[in-house]
Amino acid sequence: MALPFALLMALVVLSCKSSCSLDCDLPQTHSLGHRRTMMLLAQMRRISLFSCLKDRHDFRFPQEEFDGNQFQKAEAISVLHEVIQQTFNLFSTKDSSVAWDERLLDKLYTELYQQLNDLEACVMQEVWVGGTPLMNEDSILAVRKYFQRITLYLTEKKYSPCAWEVVRAEIMRSFSSSRNLQERLRRKE
């Protein structure tokens, strides 16, 4: 009995050490997951964006929230987390499951979920180690309003294929800005 318990404790310690040693550095696995998410979003394209030019819309992407200069690391991570959470919510709707290939959508859910877990572990460590305040409420609110505008647009367009295509392209744009923010954070370290 003592040997299995000791082995279990050793595994717990090693597991904690590997996940707690991230030092909130947005791990390489998160970066790879981010890249895979972008590839999945690109693969999800069903129709040409050019055939949907009449449906283009300015969602007023909150670019200032992604500039990264005014952020503390924990605040930036909270903004990244919010973008991924809102993207997950957007593509988890019943209307989304009708619009997209189910196999690709399942892969997208998996990637987004893993990124959320990576960021949550990072946020928890930042609180545990530094006691840093995690959220800039204005930034989080700006991201939420951005996604509300996207949801309203989809509703107004009755979740048409072109509306979803415009939204898919917009989400790719937001993920590109998120990636740029991550890179700036890494360079600051």
Swiss-Prot record:
Leader peptide range in chain numbering: 1-20
Molecular function (Gene Ontology), one example: type I interferon receptor binding
One GO cellular component, as annotated: extracellular region
Top-rank taxon: Eukaryota
Gene Ontology biological process terms from the UniProt entry: adaptive immune response; B cell activation involved in immune response; cellular response to virus; defense response to virus; humoral immune response; natural killer cell activation involved in immune response; response to exogenous dsRNA; T cell activation involved in immune response
InterPro entries in alphabetical order: 4_helix_cytokine-like_core, Interferon_alpha/beta/delta
Similarity comment: family membership: Belongs to the alpha/beta interferon family.
The protein's name: Interferon alpha-6
Gene name of the encoded protein: IFNA6
